[in-house]
């Protein structure tokens, strides 16, 4: 973590460094002096003793999902660390997390006022902003209504039951075509990223781009870097003085956000110009329509908020879905016997002459279990987006004051030996009932990839359907293999979403692809 701070400092004089150190020391002493009193009957949060200024950054290290899990064992599912100058409450354990996010959902529904969050969607992000409850609820209601309307919207031709299936089915031609051109040696992540971005772009804006369109690639690929900056541990969020020092990482982060905001703003403006209430083309039209039908009184600047919501839907959906699919392909290659079982089940259910569709999902239990096991085993979302408390509260008998940053660890919840048999092994059957004909919903609900409670992802249903459709279509048409003599490296690289290391794979055709 200390090494993460160094690139943010840049070239700073000795006098500036001394002033910064003195300022931080004074701030640290003031914070210690004004510590909140613990109410009678409640306990102080346990946790490792922090060092002045830097807090517990040395103990947290570069892989917080592992180090914070190690801290849990000798203590409790609720404890406190300090990152830089800022106290951070860490929650883990299935029961504790459910207590906080569901039973005490309102008290843990806030977002911390982190420096980096202010620059996401110009501070208008539904997911990251610190808007008050009235504004946040109005914006969430607007986004949910638009998504629900579009999720059930019929396709443009009888061939497609819903619009999502239409976008995924059309995009698979381009993706599989690219895989086939490079069959002997290709990077799956590159084409998965563009395919997923195109599906979301089609849903949000009614358009798609070629896989080799340089402008589109330059816009989409850097979006994967945004999540690294807002991962648990961005130094400027926790050591305020770093906000005023040169930082190439933050400069890049701001540039990526500004370029994408400009892209979304332009398309939303075009949609306002061409909007027709009798012809809702995409999610942006649906948002405009719902804004006109139900004006959001608590929500100022509705046009800007639509840009923020669309930006959020694109960013969150794009990153989560593309990461899930890229991990899926890696696991197919790592476990070829499971890849073959998946293919055989789909052939049995669907027959050899048609593509998977959404209505098959309830019958295809092994693919559903496979996706859940990928969520669990890869744990590519080790933390939720940071929360904060909206008022003084308590959890498990410990006092938690208003507004500290709350980290909710998903990694140990789904790697707990008490809840999961042999958690280190990859075994999709753990999510099936004994006869293998039905998914065990109780086990599946423990996978908090889309969060829970008041901050649960509103696009969860669409995201799950998209992951299923993409995976199923790829499976029935392609067989994936590792490159000869090149072992797969499944070690995750830490970030808000954890990616595997880029690699090259091979593919073989199972079925022909009609044009």
From Swiss-Prot:
GO terms for cellular component: endoplasmic reticulum membrane. Keywords: Endoplasmic reticulum, Heme, Iron, Membrane, Metal-binding, Microsome, Monooxygenase, Oxidoreductase. Signal peptide: none annotated. The keyword Mitochondrion does not apply. It catalyses: an organic molecule + reduced [NADPH--hemoprotein reductase] + O2 = an alcohol + oxidized [NADPH--hemoprotein reductase] + H2O + H(+). Heme binds at residue 457. Induction: By 3-methylcholanthrene (3MC). It is a peripheral membrane protein. GO terms for molecular function: heme binding; iron ion binding; steroid 17-alpha-monooxygenase activity. Its main location: endoplasmic reticulum. Pfam families: p450. Expressed in induced liver, kidney, gill and gut. Weakly expressed in control liver. InterPro entries: Cyt_P450 (IPR001128), Cyt_P450_CS (IPR017972), Cyt_P450_E_grp-I (IPR002401), Cyt_P450_E_grp-I_CYP1 (IPR008066), Cyt_P450_sf (IPR036396). Its cofactor is heme. One of its GO terms (biological process) is hormone biosynthetic process. It is found in: Endoplasmic reticulum membrane; Microsome membrane. Its EC number is 1.14.14.1. Belongs to the cytochrome P450 family. Cytochromes P450 are a group of heme-thiolate monooxygenases. They oxidize a variety of structurally unrelated compounds, including steroids, fatty acids, and xenobiotics. This is Cytochrome P450 1A1. It comes from Pagrus major. The gene is cyp1a1.
């Amino acid at each position: 973590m200390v090494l993460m701070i160094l690139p943010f400092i840049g070239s700073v004089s000795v006098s500036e460094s001394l002033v910064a150190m003195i300022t931080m020391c004074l701030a640290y002493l003031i914070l210690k002096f004004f510590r909140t009193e613990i109410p009678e009957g409640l306990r102080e949060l346990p946790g490792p003793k922090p060092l002045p200024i830097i807090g517990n950054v040395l103990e947290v290290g570069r892989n917080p999902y592992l180090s914070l899990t190690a801290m849990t064992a000798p203590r409790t599912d609720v404890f406190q660390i300090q990152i830089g100058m800022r106290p951070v409450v860490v929650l883990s354990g299935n029961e504790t997390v459910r207590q906080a996010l569901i039973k005490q959902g309102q008290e843990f529904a806030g977002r911390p006022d982190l420096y980096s969050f202010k620059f996401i969607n110009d501070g208008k992000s539904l997911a990251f902003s610190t808007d008050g409850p009235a504004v946040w609820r109005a914006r969430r209601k607007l986004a949910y209504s638009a998504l629900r309307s579009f999720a059930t919207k019929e396709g443009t031709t009888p061939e497609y039951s819903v619009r999502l299936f239409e976008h995924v089915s059309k995009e698979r031609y381009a993706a599989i075509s690219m895989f086939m051109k490079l069959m002997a040696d290709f990077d799956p992540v590159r084409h998965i990223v563009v395919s997923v971005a195109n599906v979301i772009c089609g849903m949000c804006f009614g358009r798609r781009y070629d896989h080799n369109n340089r402008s589109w690639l330059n816009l989409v690929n850097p979006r994967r870097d945004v999540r690294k900056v807002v991962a648990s541990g961005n130094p400027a969020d926790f050591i305020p003085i770093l906000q005023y020092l040169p930082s190439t990482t933050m400069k890049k982060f701001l540039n990526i956000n500004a370029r994408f905001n400009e892209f979304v703003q332009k398309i939303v403006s075009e949609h306002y110009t061409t909007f027709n209430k009798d012809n809702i083309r995409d999610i942006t039209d649906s948002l405009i329509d719902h804004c006109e039908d139900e004006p959001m009184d608590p929500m100022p600047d509705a046009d800007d908020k639509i840009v923020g919501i669309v930006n959020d839907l694109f960013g969150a959906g794009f990153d989560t879905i593309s990461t899930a699919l890229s991990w899926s392909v890696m696991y197919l290659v790592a476990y070829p016997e499971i890849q073959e079982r998946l293919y055989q089940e789909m052939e049995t259910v669907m027959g050899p002459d048609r593509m998977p569709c959404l209505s098959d999902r309830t019958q295809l239990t092994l693919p559903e279990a496979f996706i859940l096991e990928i969520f669990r085993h890869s744990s590519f979302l080790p933390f939720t987006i940071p929360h904060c408390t909206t008022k003084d509260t308590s959890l498990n008998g410990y006092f938690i004051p208003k507004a500290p940053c709350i980290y909710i660890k998903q990694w140990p919840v789904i790697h707990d030996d008490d809840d999961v048999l042999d958690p280190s092994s990859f075994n999709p059957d753990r999510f099936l009932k004994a006869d293998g004909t039905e998914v065990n919903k109780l086990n599946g609900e423990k996978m908090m990839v889309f969060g829970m409670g008041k901050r649960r992802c509103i696009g969860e249903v669409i995201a799950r359907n998209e992951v299923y459709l993409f995976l199923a279509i790829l499976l029935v048409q392609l067989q994936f293999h590792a490159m000869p003599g090149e072992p797969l490296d499944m070690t995750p690289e830490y970030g808000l979403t954890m990616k595997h290391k880029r690699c090259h794979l091979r593919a073989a055709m199972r079925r022909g692809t009609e044009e």
